[in-house]
């Protein structure tokens, strides 16, 4: 057996203290265990299952791909990126504008509850566990309810966590929660759920990259069926989820 070692590459270099802290915080803040209540929301997916739009792993993958590329996934990424940059530039006017636009952009009352309840919980937990000098000022500048992606962008900026990593981690967390809801509703097994998550990797990366470069004028949704699902869920007779 050979005892020679492969040459060390840059990928094997250790993380800096700052990189390690950023990674640790992202893994914590966007973990399913972080108590923002994400497990209780399906973003209208519960109605899509009842209506027969989502019936198995392939149809769930297609539904979520559309939401990532043309709906809530991409739009939330844009809001996150613009909130992050506004905080980094200490531009309170821009931050307030993004915060107001993000809450106005959701298509239904339940989706509004979903994003603002998670945003509020996220801010409160981070404020108590990871206090930051600039966090209170940034939150106060918004002067109203915070959408979840705005809250994440705001917190990451005040803690100096890189934007690109934040975007990808956020979208991964959102998609993972959608898949978790789908697994309970369809239902799907654990292996099928992971196959869907693996299949969505390119879409998550692409949505994050596109959102990072997008302007607010690029915002828009073409997922009419998903928006309708979030509206019809409000009157769905039997429900497991709050949206």
Curated annotation (Swiss-Prot):
InterPro entries: UreF, UreF_sf. It holds the Pfam family UreF. One of its GO terms (cellular component) is cytoplasm. It comes from the Bacteria. Required for maturation of urease via the functional incorporation of the urease nickel metallocenter. Belongs to the UreF family. HAMAP family: UreF. This is Urease accessory protein UreF. It comes from Rhodopseudomonas palustris (strain BisB5). The lineage of its organism: Bacteria, Pseudomonadati, Pseudomonadota, Alphaproteobacteria, Hyphomicrobiales.
């Amino acid at each position: 057996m050979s005892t020679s070692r492969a040459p060390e590459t840059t990928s094997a270099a250790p993380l800096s203290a700052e990189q390690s802290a950023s990674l640790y915080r992202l893994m914590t803040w966007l973990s399913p265990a972080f108590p923002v209540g994400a497990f209780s929301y399906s973003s209208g997916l519960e109605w899509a299952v009842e209506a027969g739009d989502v019936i198995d792993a392939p149809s769930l993958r297609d539904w979520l791909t559309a939401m990532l590329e043309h709906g809530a996934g991409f739009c939330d990424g844009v809001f996150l990126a613009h909130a992050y940059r506004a905080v980094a530039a200490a531009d309170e006017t821009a931050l307030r504008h993004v915060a107001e636009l993000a809450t106005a952009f959701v298509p239904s009352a339940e989706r509004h509850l979903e994003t603002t309840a998670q945003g509020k919980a996220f801010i409160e937990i981070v404020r108590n566990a990871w206090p930051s000098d600039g966090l209170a000022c940034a939150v106060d500048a918004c002067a109203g309810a915070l959408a979840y992606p705005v809250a994440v962008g705001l917190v990451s900026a005040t803690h100096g966590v890189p934007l690109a990593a934040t975007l990808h981690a956020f979208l991964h967390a959102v998609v993972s929660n959608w898949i978790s809801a789908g697994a309970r509703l369809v239902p799907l097994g654990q292996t099928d759920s992971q196959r869907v998550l693996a299949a969505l990797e390119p879409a998550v990366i692409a949505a994050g990259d596109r959102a990072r470069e997008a302007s607010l004028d690029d915002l828009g949704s073409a997922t009419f069926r998903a928006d309708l699902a979030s509206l019809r869920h409000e009157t769905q007779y039997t429900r497991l989820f709050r949206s």
